[in-house]
Each structure stands twice: as structure tokens, then as C-alpha cells.
């Protein structure tokens, strides 16, 4: 079994060694320009077109929680990957716990009004504020996949009213489920904290815009943990300036690194991190990939395959 690996920033030698230990019958190599030798599987992140084009692979693994980086390149270069070759994304591999940590900490930060107390501290003002109640602090999760389910599960323990919005109805205990555009308004109008975990598809690009934000209660919060292209940044800033939104926490941006001239850097009610909410944890990724390859070789059912038509 031949496996090729490509990632622009990961330590390729470590991955090659770890994969060969996990799959003793495999020969793993780092792909380099000009390598046209046969391979059975490819592990990639933002691969050059020539790496995959024309190859008769059994499967491709995207080294991230989504396959959108490859799918977007396929739109421009359909010859890059034959439609018959399955594409897999990393299922959880430690990302679920990281998303739980991030989401819970930020919801509690807003719920306990730490953002307000930081603003008072900057003014040297000693001023206890009225508490929020859980009943008025409904959390809505856009995107009900593996990570959305993990975040909902972690927030349940804190007693917040929970709701989710997705393509298909969910039956998660203690979570109200809303489906499709026809139920989006009902989902939004009682959502105090909006958490975005949507996949990156043609239908979701720019979805967090002025029309959507206007349907949230006054003084709502937005937490974007999915993709920067989901947010119309000018609309978000306008909603913050008008008071429609009380705060935003952003981990992802339409352009990364975020340009120095972006007004997001300087807005007092925008907090941000540099796309670190849930990073690939190598050991857990190796475990998932090696297990899935073994199942594929045995003809067993597997999970994590990207539906190219849906985009996730």
C-alpha cells in the first residue's frame, strides 16, 4: 500500500513515521513536485492540483474538519480529482473537545458579563451590574453536524435553553430543532447567542448578513467558529455599531491572516483568535485515518466521507 502526504506547514517527517507505525504494511512518502509515482491514498491540506490530477487513488483524506478547501479548488480545476474517488474529512479527532472548551468559555464570558466588567475596568469604574438569567440567554447553534452536537452537549450541563438550525431535523435531548429557510426566523428571534458551525457551501457563504442579524433579539452575541466567508464583516460591524449586537467573538475571517487595516482589529466589542478554535491533533488524526484505511481495505463501512453535491 502506497500513501502520499502533503501539508504546507505540518512536519512531514513526523507524519510519515507515525503513519508507517500505525499501518505497518504501508509505505508512506511526502509528496514533492514531480512525484508521479503510483499511490493508493493521499493525505492532504491545500494540495497543488498536479499532486492529485490523473491519479487512480482509493481515497483522499483532507487533514481538517471540512473538505471545503479541496472542493473549492475542484470547482476551478475539476480535473484535480476524479468524481469516483471518495474524499474524507477528519471526524472529530480531538476537535470536538476543543470546540466545546471554546464555546462554553465564551458563552459563560458573556453570560457573566465579563466583557462589560472589562470595559468598566478600563474606565476605572467599580460598578456591580445586574445579572443575566439563563432563561433569557438562549443559545442557538447553526450547523448540527459532529461539532455542533458536541457543543450542544457541553452547553446542556450549564442549563441554557438550546436550539439548533440545520438541513434536517435533529432529535437531540433538550435541544429545539429548526430546519431550512422556512424556520430560520423562528430559530433566530429567540437566540441570544448565535454560534456558527455551518459547513462552507455555496448556500452558506455570506449567510450571516444584515438580513439575518436583524432577526436576532437586540443585544445578541455572535460566535463564529466555522468559516470566515459565512460572515459579511461590514454587516457585522454595522450591527455592533447600532447596538443590535452587543458583542462578537471571531475565530475565522474572510481573509487570513486578517489584514492590519481591518476595522475588526480596533472595534471595542469584537474579540478574536487566529483560527485556533479546533486544530488538527496529529495523534488522534493518525488514529482515525489508519482505522478508516484499514476498514476501506477490508470493504467495511466507514464514516466521514464528504458528500460532494452537498459540499460537506
UniProtKB/Swiss-Prot annotation:
Transmembrane region(s): none
GO MF: glyoxylate reductase (NADPH) activity; hydroxypyruvate reductase (NADH) activity; hydroxypyruvate reductase (NADPH) activity; NAD binding
Reactions it catalyzes: glycolate + NADP(+) = glyoxylate + NADPH + H(+); (R)-glycerate + NAD(+) = 3-hydroxypyruvate + NADH + H(+); (R)-glycerate + NADP(+) = 3-hydroxypyruvate + NADPH + H(+)
Active site per the UniProt annotation: 227, 275 (proton donor)
EC number: 1.1.1.79, 1.1.1.81
Enzyme superclass (EC): oxidoreductase
Localization annotation: Cytoplasm
Coiled coil: none
Gene3D superfamilies with a match to the protein in the record: NAD(P)-binding Rossmann-like Domain (3.40.50.720)
GO cellular component terms, A-Z: cytoplasm
A Pfam family this chain is assigned to: 2-Hacid_dh_C
InterPro entries associated with the record: D-isomer_DH_NAD-bd (IPR006140), GhrA_Enterobacterales (IPR023514), NAD(P)-bd_dom_sf (IPR036291)
Keyword tags: Cytoplasm, NAD, NADP, Oxidoreductase
HAMAP family for the chain: 2_Hacid_dh_C_GhrA
UniProt function note: Catalyzes the NADPH-dependent reduction of glyoxylate and hydroxypyruvate into glycolate and glycerate, respectively.
Family the UniProt entry places it in: Belongs to the D-isomer specific 2-hydroxyacid dehydrogenase family. GhrA subfamily.
NCBIfam families per the UniProt record, alphabetical: PRK15469.1
Protein name: Glyoxylate/hydroxypyruvate reductase A
Provenance organism: Salmonella dublin (strain CT_02021853)
Source taxonomy: Bacteria, Pseudomonadati, Pseudomonadota, Gammaproteobacteria, Enterobacterales
